[in-house]
Amino acid sequence: MIKGIQITQAANDNLLNSFWLLDSEKNEARCLCAKGEFAEDQVVAVSELGQIEYRELPVNVAPTVKVEGGQHLNVNVLRRETLEDAVNNPDKYPQLTIRVSGYAVRFNSLTPEQQRDVITRTFTESL
């Protein structure tokens, strides 16, 4: 179990008023904020803190979501007509940039087959 603390008394003056997360299962403390010898995010054994007194602080832990094979969304704010015109008149659109698989790419640098694929995948009649 993890609990948040603020150290109110300690033999080491650098610990006074510092904030920590204590992990009772691992017997470790993670520094959130302290003066002197402890760095932010430094993890130490609880015993390294020595004799301390503290007050508990509320801790909100956001649940983590692990998704494999999750969803991916590319947003292109264009009209179908613009892309089709770029296929037929590439000189009019030298700077036209689109998102493909998370990367920005110049539309004119794609092969004609890739350009058609982008248009087909981007503009559908229904889901």
Curated annotation (Swiss-Prot):
The keyword Transport does not apply. Gene3D superfamilies: 3.20.70.20. It holds the Pfam family Gly_radical. Keywords: Organic radical. PROSITE patterns: GLY_RADICAL_1 (PS00850), GLY_RADICAL_2 (PS51149). The keyword Disulfide bond does not apply. SUPFAM superfamilies: PFL-like glycyl radical enzymes. GO terms for molecular function: formate C-acetyltransferase activity. InterPro entries: Auton_GlycylRad_Cofactor, Form_AcTrfase_GR_CS, Gly_radical, Glycyl_radical_cofactor_GrcA. GO terms for cellular component: cytosol. The modification Glycine radical is found at G102. Residues 5-127 form the Glycine radical domain. Acts as a radical domain for damaged PFL and possibly other radical proteins. This is Autonomous glycyl radical cofactor. It comes from Haemophilus influenzae (strain PittGG). The lineage of its organism: Bacteria, Pseudomonadati, Pseudomonadota, Gammaproteobacteria, Pasteurellales. The gene is grcA.
